[in-house]
Design a protein with these regions (language model features):
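Acidic, metal-coordinating helix/loop segments flanking the phosphotransfer/catalytic sites
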Residues: 32-51, 91
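Hydrophobic/aromatic residues positioned on beta-strands within the core alpha/beta folds
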Residues: 83-84
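Two-component/phosphorelay signaling modules centered on CheY-like receiver
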Residues: 13-31
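Conserved phosphotransfer microenvironments
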Residues: 55-72
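Conserved phosphotransfer cores of two-component systems
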Residues: 44-47, 71-77, 90, 94
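C-terminal output helix
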Residues: 106-118, 123
Length: 127
């Protein structure tokens, strides 16, 4: 079985590095881009992720409330989880209701568990 490609959309290189390390240690094949425009270019180059982890406040999404739809348009069928330091009450005022959301700072085990759960939601995946 090949490693699942997990796309990380994150503008903070330190967080991206940590997430990349955790996913690689868990046996996945992480790929990192800094914003939605780079994710679009990555897709246009013929890449397809098994799942996407994205920071909520990344450039090129049209706003945090539009990020889930923007990512879904680029990667149809790929499950998405958001990562953010924005508190829950602030997310509500931004119009963000997408789940799952991993709140920063997060435990590394929570990240690994989230990715496992995301991969289990892919079409054609048996549980």
């Amino acid at each position: 079985m090949s490693a699942a490609v997990i796309l990380i959309i994150e503008d903070d290189v330190h967080i991206a590095g940590l997430v990349t390390h955790v996913l690689r240690e868990a046996g996945h094949a992480p790929a990192h881009v800094r914003d939605v425009n780079a994710a679009r270019a990555w897709a246009e180059a013929g890449n397809t992720p098994a799942a996407v982890l994205s920071d909520l406040m990344v450039a090129g999404s049209g706003g945090p409330d539009r990020l889930p739809d923007t990512v879904a348009a680029i990667f149809p069928g790929a499950p998405l989880a958001l990562m953010t330091g924005v508190p829950r009450n602030r997310r509500a005022t931004l119009g963000v209701s997408h789940e799952p959301i991993l709140e920063k700072p997060f435990e590394l085990e929570a990240l690994a568990d989230l990715v496992t759960a995301l991969l289990a939601t892919r079409p054609g995946t048996t549980r």
